[in-house]
Structures are given as C-alpha cells and as structure tokens.
Amino acid sequence: MSANVLLVSHGELAKSMCESLKMLVGDVGKFEYVCLDNDGVDKFRNSFRLKIDNIDNDKEVYVLCDIKGGTPFNEAFKYKLENKADFRILTGMNIPMLLDIYFNLDNLNSEQIILNSKESIEII
C-alpha cells in the first residue's frame, strides 16, 4: 500500500521542503503542502481541510509538521479529532525524514522514520 504525504508549516517551509525534495529525487507527486502565511489561520485551516479531504483515503496518509504544538500541528490535530480521521501526524519534519518516506512509500513504518530522522542529526 502506498502512502500520501501532506507537509504543513509556518511560512514557506513546507513548500521549500517539497521543492528541495524534488531537486533531490525528481517527481514528488504523492507529496503536497499547505503553508501558514500572513493571510492567517482561517485560510490555512480551509486549505488544509481541502487538501486532506481530497487525498486518496484508500492509502495511508501522513501529515508532517514543522513544530509540535504550533498552529499547523494544532489545526491538523484538531481536524483529526473532530473528524475521526485516520492519518498519522509526524512532527519535526526534515529532509532526511522526507527522503526516508519517499524511498519507502510502499512500506512505511512511522516509528522507524522517526528513529532514522533522529539518527541523521549529528555533531561533526
């Protein structure tokens, strides 16, 4: 079973991360994004709901957030609770996490993705 991925963030981070992933791997068709910008929370909420409602629910859905407890996370979590939606929310998104998900779309393991992302952080 393949998965769909929705990135959400403050500012243009989610968009930039999708663009960076595309630069590294090419087609990122199953990755989409919604950004919280200066237009406010209502616009973000509507954009998020539109995206999440139109994602193929026959596949796993992962929502990747920049910050746990931030507005994009809170809106995703609120939607999940209110709609009993079946998607996973992962926080602290980074490029290694996106690459791990991209290369394992057919066999995702949330716990392993988090572990791999943590292991990619080093002091050299």
Model region roles, listed by residue range:
Residues 2-64, 68-124:
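N-terminal loops that bind phosphate or other acidic moieties
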